[in-house]
Structure formats: structure tokens, C-alpha cells
Curated annotation (Swiss-Prot):
Catalysed transformations (reactions): orotidine 5'-phosphate + H(+) = UMP + CO2
Keywords: Decarboxylase, Lyase, Pyrimidine biosynthesis
Gene3D superfamilies: Aldolase class I (3.20.20.70)
Protein name in the entry: Orotidine 5'-phosphate decarboxylase
Protein family membership: Belongs to the OMP decarboxylase family. Type 2 subfamily.
SMART domains documented for this protein: OMPdecase (SM00934)
Enzyme Commission number: 4.1.1.23
BP GO terms, sorted: 'de novo' pyrimidine nucleobase biosynthetic process; 'de novo' UMP biosynthetic process
Pfam families in UniProt: OMPdecase (PF00215)
Length: 274
């Protein structure tokens, strides 16, 4: 299988630089006249799969599936499989982070041969970047990607991410350590380790040497503006992967309306890969 960085670049070139989120919040299920049950969750996801099958990347928010227990995980497995069958890259927004054998177990679940394994997964480095090693190794072995939280847009994040250590912010250290992995594993091409930088972050870390993709959540309802993303953190053209969820999902449940809302956002960010 081709490495994740190359597959992501190819998907963006063919389908455009947008990641669409599947966030089945109970309020959204009710707004779509669906029950807040595993059956309602499944119906919500079926609609999203049909609407977003033509986009490059789709990002299910794992927490909303976990809330329904085993039945929710079954819906997530089915949704991941359906999206991948449609040629969509799936980014599982699980934000996993732990140490030792526990991290290795998370790695097996989200980046190994598990039915939950997607094309990429989000991860938290705040037990130390080195704690992610089992996940990074599993992802590399299975040609999957990892997006590591660096600078998030929630106000609380700044208390940790903008703290200084060894002359750099913690967010910059995360980016720099991800860059080391990318240089050591794929110096000639796009790496498989990306970072997450919120669209509303006022002082983003320097991304120019990352050598991997940058997931940029927070467009639309959360305040991020597509026209303001160019050159975020010194990113190169084609490096950014903007993500949107609520701005699009509130157009549902009609499949055509959902697809049109996602298309409008894609049109707004297409210049980033031009």
C-alpha cells in the first residue's frame, strides 16, 4: 500500500482539500428527526456516507459513537467500512494518548488490523511525544497516518500548548518532534505524521519544516474563516487540510443539501491547493 502522506496528497488532488466531519451529536439527531439511539446513529451515518462519498477525507468523531456502547462501535465500524469502500480516506477523531502497553493497545485498535482502524487517527501527545511511539510505529507499518494535537482552538488549550520549554512553546515542540519522525521515515515525500492546528489559533506554531499534513478544524460555526487560512504557520501550498463539521451538518438531513453545503465549503478552501 502507498504511504498515507502520498495517498492523502492524491485524494486532495482528485477530490479537493476538505475534511468533512461526522459528528452525530444528540441535538443534531433530534434536529434531523432521528431518535437518540444506536438506530438513530446508524441512520445519521448512512445519510452522511451517501452525502460525503465524493470528498477526500471524512472524520467521524469517535466520542459520539462511544456514547452508545458496543452498538455505537458497531455503527462506527460499518461507517468506516462504507466510506473506505467509496474511496474516501477516513480519519478517526479519537484523540488517543497513553503510555506503554496501553498505548500499544490503542495503536492496535486504531492503526493495526482492527475493524476500527481507519486511514488515520488523531492522537494526544500530552503524556510526552515519545509516549506515542507504539502508535507511530503501528501506523507506519500499516501505511496509516497520525494527526497529533499541537495547537487547538479551545481557550483552555493555550495554558499548556503556549507554555515555554527549552526556548519553544509546547505546541512548537510537538510540531518539531513530528517533523523529526517524518524526516527519518520519508525524507523525500509527504510524511505520515501530521499535526492539528485550530483555524482560530492566533499564534500558530511554525509549520514550515513539518514535512507532513496539517489538519485545521474549526471552520464555519466555530469561527474559522476559509479566506484566512493561507500560509497558516508558514505552511506550504497543499499542506493544509481544513476540516468542517457543524457548518455542513446543520444543512441535513437532506442528502443533496448536505452535499451542497460541503461543496460550498470546498469551493471556499480550494485555493489552498491551487
Amino acid at each position: 500500500m502507498t504511504g498515507f502522506g502520498a495517498r492523502l496528497a492524491a485524494a486532495k488532488a482528485q477530490r479537493g482539500p476538505l475534511c468533512v466531519g461526522i459528528d452525530p451529536h444528540p441535538e443534531l439527531l433530534r434536529a434531523w428527526d432521528l431518535p437518540t439511539t444506536a438506530d438513530g446513529l446508524a441512520a445519521f451515518c448512512d445519510i452522511c456516507v451517501e452525502a460525503f462519498a465524493g470528498f477526500a477525507v471524512v472524520k467521524p468523531q469517535v466520542a459520539f459513537f462511544e456514547a452508545y456502547g458496543a452498538a455505537g462501535f458497531a455503527v462506527l465500524e460499518r461507517t468506516i467500512a462504507a466510506l473506505r469502500s467509496a474511496g474516501v480516506l477516513v480519519l478517526a477523531d479519537a484523540k488517543r494518548g497513553d503510555i506503554g502497553t496501553t498505548m500499544a493497545a490503542y495503536a492496535a485498535a486504531w492503526a493495526g488490523d482492527s475493524p476500527l482502524a481507519a486511514d488515520a487517527v488523531t492522537a494526544s501527545p500530552y503524556l510526552g511525544f515519545g509516549s506515542l511511539r507504539p502508535l507511530l510505529e503501528a501506523a507506519a507499518a500499516h501505511d496509516r497516518g497520525v494527526f497529533v494535537l499541537a495547537a487547538t482552538s479551545n481557550p483552555e488549550g493555550a495554558t499548556v500548548q503556549r507554555a515555554a520549554f527549552d526556548g519553544r512553546t509546547v505546541a512548537q515542540l510537538v510540531v518539531d518532534q513530528a517533523a523529526v519522525v517524518n524526516r527519518s521515515t520519508n525524507p523525500a515525500g509527504p510524511g505520515y505524521v501530521g499535526v492539528v492546528v485550530g483555524a482560530t489559533v492566533l499564534q500558530p506554531p511554525d509549520l514550515s519544516a513539518l514535512g507532513g499534513p496539517v489538519l485545521v478544524p474549526g471552520l464555519g460555526v466555530q469561527g474559522g474563516r476559509p479566506e484566512a487560512l493561507a500560509g497558516l504557520g508558514g505552511a506550504e501550498p497543499g499542506q493544509l487540510l481544513p476540516a468542517v463539521a457543524r457548518e455542513v451538518l446543520r444543512a441535513g438531513p437532506d442528502v443533496a443539501e448536505l452535499r451542497a453545503a460541503a461543496d460550498r465549503m470546498l469551493d471556499a478552501v480550494a485555493y489552498l491547493d491551487a
